[in-house]
Amino acid sequence: MDNLTNSIDQVVEENSLPHEWSKEVLAELKDLGVKNNKRDDLRKIPFVTIDGKDAKDFDDAVFCEANKDGFVLQVAIADVAEIVEPSSSIDKEALSRGTSIYFPKRVIPMLPEEISNNLCSLIPNEDRNVLVCKMNFTQEGEINSYDFSESIINSHKRFTYNEVEFLKQNKDTNLSADILNSINALEKLTKQLLNNRSKRYALEIESSEPTLSFGNEGNISEIFIPKRLFAHQMIEEAMISANICAAKFIKKHLGFGVYRIHEEPEHLKLENLKKFFSLKGLSTKSFSSPLEMINSFIKHVNKDEKNKITNVLILQSLKRACYSTKEIGHFGLQLKEYSHFTSPIRR
């Protein structure tokens, strides 16, 4: 047993993290399977997944096409509820865990691997039940209309972020024209969505979270901060768009819902942040709103790579995003309506 394994085991033990499955959960797993109920058949549409190279639970797939009016983006999300019955032992265990926990080289999943890495994972060339959010965008990247459907898809390819980034510079002739056209359309739509994000002054705080590499004995061999790629933003903006539509949908059809909210920062924390940047020589006198002030600080920090550690201080001044039945909007994203419809395998 190496040093890394020992360290993770210690963290699991000290925090009493549930990491084994009960007999009841294991018994239910034997009877699970993909149901063949009536669904929209979208298997011919070239959906693809785009994830990190080490990902095993593929819970979202995308397809995008451009037309004379703008863009049509379809986001397919694994339909976990089709497999996990309400109040079942698996459901109760997922509720207890709340989220998957990711350690280096180890994951403690919220759902058993048979579900998260197989039955609900959008593996290439496998039929999977999904919920699809189909969105029509204008040329400027504004959502014109949307609808949700219970569908079945068959992922045509599993991409990594680096592979999609490579495609932006080098067109892979081994890929079908449909897949290439979809990636190109999503790239163009993402540029519009990022432009809209900038116009509404959503916060753009780049993560300085390091990634660790480990040697054979479990010792740290390298520490580095991974580069954020445009391919990451393609998926992020696609998921944000789907989550906006999810919030609108539940509000329209149910009159209430569970929203992902982010409140404005507290006055005292903003004052402390102002003092810090004032000592750094930055003028802090002429801001009309907390949003303008924080964006100014972020812009200042991002001018120099050496300053980016200061992003941690900005993050600490913000409130934590949370779930609520009160729809008060998302300060960081500058959205009035926002929920979490995506990533049902891990949260």
Tell me the role of every PLM-derived stretch.
Residues 1-347:
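Electropositive polyanion-binding surfaces
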